[in-house]
Every structure is written in C-alpha cells, then in structure tokens.
C-alpha cells in the first residue's frame, strides 16, 4: 500500500517539526461504494479509513490529514478501459451494470477539470479552517451529502429488484440526480 509507505517515510519529520499536512487522494466512491467497482471502491474506502484514523492519531502533533475525494474528472481514463468495452447483456447483474452506467454518464455530464483537484489540494493544505474531507465536483459533493443522509441499509436495499422508475426515483431522492435523463 504505497500511501502507507509514503506516510511512514514523512511522518517522523512532521511530528518532530510539529507541523505538516498529509494529503490522501481518495475518491467519491470512498464515501459510498458503487456496484461493479468493488476493488476500486474497497481501495478508496481503505484510504478514507486510513486518513480518518491517522488524522485522529497525529492531531496532537500539529499534523493535519486531509482526504481529497474527486468525483468524475475530465480525463481520457475510460477511453481504453475494459469496463467500457465489455458489457455482458446476459449477465444476471445487467440491471445493476446498466444503472451504474447511467450514474457514470451523469457524472461525465458534470465532470470537472483536473485542475480543480489541484486547486482543492492547495486550499486543503493552506486553509486555516481544517476539514478532513474535501469532495471535488458536483457528483462527489452529492455522494458526500448523501452519505450523511442515507442509512447504509437503505443504500443496500436499492440493489433489490426495483423497476428502473423506482430506482431512478430513489436515486434522485437521495442524490438529486435524475438518471432517467441520461
């Protein structure tokens, strides 16, 4: 886990100086796990947990920890992605895959430039007003807000066999995103 090795390398000098800021670049899916992205979501949840626990642990040493949580960013990452080229229409997970595709399509409509992530990092490390979590982009902010409003059991229950209309209605209610328009 590269983040842990990096933190282990810099933390002793930050502690001795009684200052510093560790920046973890996580993801909006580190706040609310998305189906069909389990390994990615799990790795980002782990980094979220690391940041939260470490922030508590090193606060007394004057060291800040921030988790920067981008949503969809305007890059070419999906151009050659296997996920975009392989879509098994006979899969029993097809409804979930289709809906998750709509979530991403919605995110692409509101994607932000990579520079916005850099600006957020700069703000997070220079502001006097400390916050642990820094969502980047409207989709990330929506997931951040929803994570604090939706019970985990309600999110899980959205995996039930709902009609697209029911699912879209619930999704819009929780996240403010109308998937029927994607």
Which functions belong to the PLM regions below?
Residues 7, 43:
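Active-site helix of classical SDR
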Residues 32, 53-64:
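Active-site-adjacent segment of SDR/Rossmann-fold oxidoreductases
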Residues 32-38:
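Active-site loop immediately N-terminal to the catalytic Tyr-X3-Lys motif
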Residues 27:
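Residue(s) in the substrate-gating loop at a strand-loop-helix junction
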Residues 59, 63-108:
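C-terminal beta-strand-loop-alpha-helix "lid" module of Rossmann-like NAD(P)-dependent dehydrogenases
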Residues 1-2, 17-20, 45:
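Conserved internal alpha-helix in NAD(P)-dependent oxidoreductase domains
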Residues 9-18:
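A short helix-coil junction within the Rossmann-fold of NAD(P)-dependent oxidoreductases
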Residues 108-146:
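Core catalytic loop region at the nicotinamide-binding pocket of NAD(P)H-dependent oxidoreductases
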